[in-house]
Each structure stands twice: as C-alpha cells, then as structure tokens.
From Swiss-Prot:
The lineage of its organism: Viruses, Viruses incertae sedis, Naldaviricetes, Lefavirales, Baculoviridae. InterPro entries: Alphabaculovirus_Y056 (IPR020122). This is Uncharacterized 9.7 kDa protein. Pfam families: DUF2719 (PF10891). It comes from Orgyia pseudotsugata multicapsid polyhedrosis virus.
Amino acid sequence: MLRALRRRFKPAGDERRREENVVLCPRCYFVAPGSISVADYTRMHIKFNEQFADECSNNLAVTQPKTWFNYTNCPLLYYSLC
C-alpha cells in the first residue's frame, strides 16, 4: 500500500525527487497531501465519504490546529514518503 502512495505523490521518471508528506485515514484509506490544513482535510474526507455507501466513522474533532505539525491527538496517520 505504501508503494501505491509513493507513486501517487512522487514525480515519475527524471523529474526532481522531492519529499512529500501525506495523511491517511486507516479506516477508509482516504489519502490527502500533508500540506493542507486539518479543517480542509476534514472537509475533503467528508466529501469523499459522501460518495460511498459505507461512510467512515473516523471524524476529527478539529479544535484549533491549522497544520498537522505537532498535532498528537489525531486518529489519522501522517506519513513521510521519502
């Protein structure tokens, strides 16, 4: 699964390699770039799950954080794809 994530977020071929962080929901496998805010991720996650019959119950309680940096109380996985 991580190999598929790397292919999705890394440039292919001769393009310059760069590090990309992604956020993964372990229940529905929704993946988004780690550079977006927590509130944006929550909106995208809800919109993604509205398209499917089985909605993911893994909702975030967004308080004040604007980025994923130092956000420890979170039911999501933050990966660094290098």
